């Protein structure tokens, strides 16, 4: 397994596939290589013309973590991956990973060649105080060492019925998700910082082309969030995919990535 070492000493495990211009896939909450069944499909389909990097975000899978957490440290992880592929790369981010990728694009304007965001889960109607309170609740669970409760809280927050959450906790698949439960605090921190009124000013540093994509079968707030992000980032464009939701078909989104980065 190839690895890179981030600036704070964290080891980031990744896979590299294909040849051509590099695209780094930035995962959303709960996603990592051991459980992700969608990202590998896109990686395979794009590897005939791009170098695709998939990696475990810090604290997940084969990547280590060093406390305390800061969004900048995850940006540093992405910078280390970009260096490993020659100093230039495009970024594709899914959900909260799209927001992290946006922060990296703003922080690394000379290194990121383009950014495709799929459904950044920013609710323009949510106040920064609410976002920070949600982060504080996750941080408290993390401090108490309760990754399972963190995962259950997250799943309930995205609409999974309580009975389904309870059933999932009894299933064989639960252990792989509970294993990364503590990292949900990272995603909530990313989203809280993005909800802050200072975020659009940071994003003005973006120089690369940006495409913000959503599916028309997703929750309405996903559309509103995608629209808001697109108007907050210089030169960003928008696209909506018919029939797609937050759990998209990789055979539909993959060609969009190919067209944008090609």
Model-derived features: positions:
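Active-site loop/oxyanion-hole signature of alpha/beta-hydrolase fold enzymes
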Residues: 44-45, 53-92
């Amino acid at each position: 397994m190839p690895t890179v070492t981030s600036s704070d000493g964290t080891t980031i495990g990744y896979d590299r596939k294909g040849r051509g211009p590099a695209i780094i896939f930035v995962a959303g909450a709960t996603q990592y290589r051991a459980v992700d069944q969608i990202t590998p499909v896109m990686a395979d389909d794009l590897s005939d013309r791009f170098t695709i990097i998939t990696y475990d975000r810090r604290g997940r899978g084969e990547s280590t973590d060093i406390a305390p957490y800061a969004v900048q440290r995850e940006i540093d992880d992405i910078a280390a991956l970009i260096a490993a592929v020659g100093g230039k790369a495009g970024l594709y981010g899914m959900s909260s990973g799209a927001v992290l990728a946006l922060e990296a694009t703003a922080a690394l304007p000379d290194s990121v060649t383009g950014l495709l965001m799929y459904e950044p889960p920013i609710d323009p109607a949510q106040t920064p105080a609410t976002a920070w309170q949600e982060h504080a609740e996750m941080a408290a669970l993390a401090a108490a060492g309760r990754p399972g409760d963190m995962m259950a809280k997250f799943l309930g927050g995205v609409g999974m019925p309580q009975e389904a959450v309870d059933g999932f906790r009894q299933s064989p698949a639960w252990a792989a998700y509970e294993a990364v439960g503590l990292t949900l605090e990272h995603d909530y921190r990313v989203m809280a910082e993005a909800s802050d009124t200072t975020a659009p000013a940071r994003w003005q540093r973006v120089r690369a082309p940006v495409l913000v994509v959503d599916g028309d079968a997703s929750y309405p707030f996903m559309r509103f969030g995608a629209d808001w992000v697109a108007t907050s980032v210089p030169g960003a464009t928008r696209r909506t995919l018919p029939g797609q939701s937050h759990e998209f078909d990789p055979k539909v989104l993959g060609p969009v990535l190919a067209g944008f980065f090609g």
